[in-house]
């Protein structure tokens, strides 16, 4: 049986893996860059990049709502977020940044 720390560390590793393998296309310039912690925080509805950093380090635990938002942002099932094999998979995604999003 997995311990709480194993689960938190798996989720943290998977979040970082998904973020660094996701690109964001800027709407005006069309430039494509890898997703930053700031961009992920904004997509999650927050302005606090420190929170994303703590999630990726496993020092803070995501709420069920935050986990749900992550699954929607990266278009991945919630159970896959807790799969230790995810970091061994091939995952690439491009998101078009919406300058009109609230």
How should these model regions be labeled?
Residues 32, 44, 59-62, 73:
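Helix-turn-helix/winged-helix DNA-binding modules
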Residues 13, 34-35, 47, 62-65:
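Residue-level signal for the short linker/turn that defines the boundary of a DNA-recognition helix
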Residues 24-54:
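Short alpha-helical DNA-recognition segment
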Residues 20, 45, 57-59, 86:
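Residue-level detection of the helix-turn-helix DNA-binding "recognition helix"
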Residues 2-5, 72, 82-102:
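Short, charged recognition helix plus adjacent turn
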Residues 63-80:
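DNA major-groove recognition helix of helix-turn-helix/homeodomain DNA-binding modules
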Residues 50-54, 65, 83:
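Base-recognition residues in the alpha-helical recognition helix of bacterial helix-turn-helix
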Residues 1-33:
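A short, Lys/Arg-rich alpha-helix, primarily the initiator
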């Amino acid at each position: 049986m997995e311990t709480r720390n194993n689960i938190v560390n798996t989720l943290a590793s998977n979040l970082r893996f998904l973020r660094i393998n996701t690109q964001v296309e800027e709407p005006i310039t069309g430039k494509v860059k890898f997703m930053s912690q700031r961009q992920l925080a904004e997509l999650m509805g927050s302005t606090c990049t420190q929170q994303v950093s703590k999630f990726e380090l496993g020092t803070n635990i995501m709420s069920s709502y935050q986990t749900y938002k992550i699954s929607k942002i990266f278009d991945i099932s919630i159970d896959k977020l807790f799969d230790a094999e995810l970091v061994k998979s091939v995952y690439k995604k491009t998101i078009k940044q919406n300058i009109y999003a609230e």
